[in-house]
């Protein structure tokens, strides 16, 4: 990056003009120190950004906007210093804290107080819109008080996600904080200035009742529940209804909002709303507990959060504590990148494998899997991932039962060994490397889990290959030993065993029946089972085909499933009754959320099998991790996302694929190993009883 990327920046050392004080804020991409002008003694906040970390275009855009803006209710950029390695912003220092933090300290709070606040914020947005600037991330965290006095004024900050929007084409970047995000942003239909009015509506709602208007139970259905809204004026409800209209063309404009009687103060209530203060304190505490960082953006790496800028906000150590909490949670569950886990998440571990995708474009790794409206994640759930179930018959002490059990166990063992060979080369797993398969997809797994894209899933490929080879070799040795023991039992058994030809014919018949059943059932997207009269080996095929033509594989479902509102906004594309995908609100961006893929739902497509010479071969190209990654990559390419975002997504997809394949393969081999041990134990038991 060149030396002078900011026009008009000061090249001389900042130490000549400012006394740099202690660090008052810290983030991944910037540090904030207190500063004192040596000439005037005026205190400022000095934000230091490394050129090697923060993207050049983002710095230039934010500085250009802040330089153009001059409003008493917007934090002012005073000076810009630049060195070979750093850009230093001298900002107006505010010490009064966030909007909600200030309000919850009050003992007396009325509708009129809320009306005054909303009126001020609306005028600030009117000023920005007059300059064709859309803030895109209007929320309480970005509304700060200038100081701690009673005369303190509100200041709007953080223009890292702001965009210019004239009368031309609409904006399409996926930016903002989900709790305050307008539906047209999450639906990717294009948006403009009305998104800021929607955010004002959400803030107004919270200011009057203490909690957000939408969650996973309501979607975008606006409600005024009792008793919280019983003492709130109809005029306030009228304003909120106008601001929270799902149709941006029918939503209140800036002028309509400012002219509304409630904003003018003529119809708002004067009585204290103590209940709202109590609820708001709870909401504010919960918001803080979840880290406060719920923003998603097209280029969040190039910006810092409000918590990094001013001393009145979260202490510096909280960033490290949050990171430690995230790391601890990640270690507790390989499939979660979560701040908190469900209390019953470890139950039915062998029946359900839930994988969470945080497709936050800023790739933030703070995700929450609670159902308490505190987070936004995407869950792709595949039930019954255990592909093979083997049930063995119990042996009895009678001689006849022992003999029957031995014969059954022999047949079952041989069948299981055959199936192990079949599965290693068909739809269940492929133990060969991508190179051996001609690059045709590498390792494939039935019902592959889509793990989170929000954390680093990096895993060295050479270590993965080494582990695979060791496990494969170990299984081969165990198989060989089991076969030898089986032959030994045949020779030592005093009971006449089935003739070789009879056994071969019996197994061949079972194998042919298996093929026919598989062909019939798989074509119907169902499960296949083989009943040999002694035990049942059941296989369930649950293909995941993220087709670009499938509703469940659409960009809105894969990328925006975290939105708790998409289910109502796009109900033409998503069938909630069939549980193809269920969206709720969560906090990686704000509140609650889950994506549920029902078994055999319309979101999955099943391919037909090819039958040749009495055997079938699965079309593995439509299954497995590689296919899912390719489908996701295809969907991402349609969005015209920034290059740096696409590069990051590609990297994470690649790392995810390696990690997921390694984990799934190990699980498969462990199951096979346990199965062989059980059969071996059964054979030994039968042998001892026989003696």
UniProtKB/Swiss-Prot annotation:
Major enzyme class: transferase
Keywords annotated in UniProt: ATP-binding, Coiled coil, Kinase, Nucleotide-binding, Serine/threonine-protein kinase, Transferase
Gene Ontology CC terms: cytoplasm
Gene Ontology BP term (one): signal transduction
Binding site for ATP: 24-32, 47
EC number, as in UniProt: 2.7.11.1
Biased composition (Low complexity): 322-336, 423-433, 512-536, 600-615
Parts of the chain that traverse the membrane: none
CDD domains reported in the protein's UniProt record: STKc_CAMK (cd05117)
Catalytic activities: L-seryl-[protein] + ATP = O-phospho-L-seryl-[protein] + ADP + H(+); L-threonyl-[protein] + ATP = O-phospho-L-threonyl-[protein] + ADP + H(+)
Highest taxon above the source species: Eukaryota
Spans annotated as Disordered: 314-350, 420-447, 510-536, 600-620
PROSITE patterns: PROTEIN_KINASE_ATP, PROTEIN_KINASE_DOM, PROTEIN_KINASE_ST
Stretches of the chain forming a coiled coil according to its record: 642-691
Protein kinase domain boundaries: 18-263
Keyword Mitochondrion in record: no
Keyword Cytoplasm: no
Pfam families named among the record's database cross-references: Pkinase
Record-level Gene Ontology MF annotations: ATP binding; protein serine kinase activity; protein serine/threonine kinase activity
Entry similarity comment: Belongs to the protein kinase superfamily. CAMK Ser/Thr protein kinase family.
Protein name: Probable serine/threonine-protein kinase pXi
Organism: Dictyostelium discoideum (Social amoeba)
Gene: pXi
